[in-house]
Amino acid sequence: MASLRELRSRIRGVNSIKKITKAQELIATSRISKAQARVAAAKPYAEEITKVLGELASASKNLSHPLLTERPNPRRAAVLVITSDSGMCGGYNSNVLKRAEELMTTLRNEGKEPVLYVMGAKGLTYYTFRNRPFVSAWTGFSQQPKYTDASAACRHLVDAFMVGSDGEVPHPNGTGDIAGVDELHIVYTRFVSMLTQTPEVRRLAPIQVSFVDENFDMGEDSFSDSPTAEVQAQYEFEPDADVLLAALLPKYVNTRIYASLLEAAASESAARRTAMKAATDNANELASVLQREANSVRQAQITQEISEIVGGVNALASSSDRD
């Protein structure tokens, strides 16, 4: 059995850790509310660009834009994986990385070469440690993403898709050129509720033609295109619909990436809150167990001291009687 000093030292250590986990839990809780507010702020723009694209799609004479066209023999597929920049969020990163591995396995089985892109320091560390090749990584904004953060990745990904696997585009790090891709996929964590976050895979390009009946609320499929919706043209466009469609489609892809970043940020905070609450509860339980053990040790020490005193008194009494 551990000594009383050791037990008290462990109790102090557990209580110190509990303060950290409790603080992290409170911070994560507040960040979830902020993430929900950012989703609400981004929703009007996402809905309007989707509405305009729907009108443009119906007014366009031909939908032959590369972002809307299926490649006959796709050979390379870009995979953008969104992870967190910091840890202490339970299985958040491991789940999304596992889903990314499943996607890349599926792509290989289909005869496509996965081309990896990473967002978040944890994903960067994961693939670097395992010597897994990736084209580029963007870090430093997982908890508070901005539209410009999505734009940094979107510009390169759209350019790579436009040229296709037969063409080349400048490397995002400015270190030469790399081959293009025929598909764009994104792997992120969808925010379902405070207790549930699920890793999701979405294909960014080629884009499905229908752009209406979409839901942009957090916890729902932020960009689930309806295959049966019908769009009626209500506007006269200048310049023509084809030109506007070509200009807005990359912005639409950027909006989808940004929406995924916002959901991932909320999911990260929710996962961290759940993990830190569990850690705090475990710390409380462990501290209680250690305190009971310390009380037992202290009680045994007191009992032993009393026994020694009583034994000493009896010995003195016996000595006095003999005298």
From Swiss-Prot:
Q: List the disulfide bonds.
A: none
Q: How does this chain sit within the bilayer?
A: Peripheral membrane protein
Which one GO biological process term can you cite for this protein? proton motive force-driven plasma membrane ATP synthesis
Q: Name one GO molecular function term.
A: proton-transporting ATP synthase activity, rotational mechanism
Q: Where in the cell is it found?
A: Cell membrane
The family database entries (Pfam families) matched by this protein are listed as: ATP-synt (PF00231)
Q: Which residues form a coiled coil?
A: none
Q: Does the keyword Nucleotidyltransferase apply?
A: no
Print the keywords alphabetically.
Answer: ATP synthesis, Cell membrane, CF(1), Hydrogen ion transport, Ion transport, Membrane, Transport
Partners and quaternary state? F-type ATPases have 2 components, CF(1) - the catalytic core - and CF(0) - the membrane proton channel. CF(1) has five subunits: alpha(3), beta(3), gamma(1), delta(1), epsilon(1). CF(0) has three main subunits: a, b and c.
| Annotated HAMAP family | ATP_synth_gamma_bact (MF_00815)
Q: Which PANTHER family match?
A: ATP SYNTHASE GAMMA CHAIN (PTHR11693), ATP SYNTHASE SUBUNIT GAMMA, MITOCHONDRIAL (PTHR11693:SF22)
**Protein family membership:** Belongs to the ATPase gamma chain family.
Return the NCBIfam families for the record: ATPsyn_F1gamma, PRK05621.1-2
Q: What is this protein called?
A: ATP synthase gamma chain
Organism annotation: Nocardia farcinica (strain IFM 10152)
